[in-house]
């Protein structure tokens, strides 16, 4: 019980960090000009653009770490297991660790969110299927007993 409480507080801490990064004012993360062209400007805004780029990298790093943690949690909770998910996810995360283009990073983030939703759906389906199996056997026994009672009463008459 204490483990889940500490894990929840850790997740909320990560969410707060991400919210703080999104709510930074006077700095737009998605400017219309490319980062390379904006750093070449001689208007004196070079320092702001570099900070902007650092903020974007920091935000993406937090998001990716949170997604990896969600995958590990799903492995712990679900029927696949942590080892299976880690063996599949870690090479993918490592192969994409050197990406620098924000569009490609966002594509990978969206793909990971999709995979998380699919794993959640698989876990729910697995749970539903197991519950259905257990109840089907129970109801089958009840129905068999009920039918046996009907047959016994018909024999008595």
Curated annotation (Swiss-Prot):
Its main location: mitochondrion. Keywords: Mitochondrion. One of its GO terms (biological process) is respiratory electron transport chain. GO terms for cellular component: mitochondrion. The keyword Mitochondrion applies. InterPro entries: Complex1_LYR_ETFRF1_LYRM5 (IPR045296), ETFRF1 (IPR052000). It is found in: Mitochondrion. Belongs to the complex I LYR family. This is Electron transfer flavoprotein regulatory factor 1 homolog.
């Amino acid at each position: 019980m204490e483990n889940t409480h500490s894990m929840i507080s850790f997740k909320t801490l990560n969410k707060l960090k991400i919210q703080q990064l999104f709510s930074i004012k006077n700095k737009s993360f998605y400017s219309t000009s490319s980062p390379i062209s904006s750093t070449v400007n001689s208007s004196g805004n070079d320092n702001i653009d570099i900070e902007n780029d650092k903020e974007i990298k920091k935000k993406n790093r937090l998001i990716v770490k949170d997604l990896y943690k969600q995958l590990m949690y799903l492995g712990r909770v679900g029927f696949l297991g942590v080892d299976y998910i880690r063996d599949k996810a870690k090479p993918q995360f490592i192969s994409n660790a050197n990406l620098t283009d924000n569009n490609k990073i966002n594509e990978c983030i969206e793909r990971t969110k999709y995979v998380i939703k699919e794993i959640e759906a698989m876990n729910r389906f697995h749970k539903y299927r197991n519950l259905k199996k257990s109840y089907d056997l129970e109801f089958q026994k009840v129905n068999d007993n009920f039918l046996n009672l009907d047959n016994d009463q018909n024999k008595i008459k």
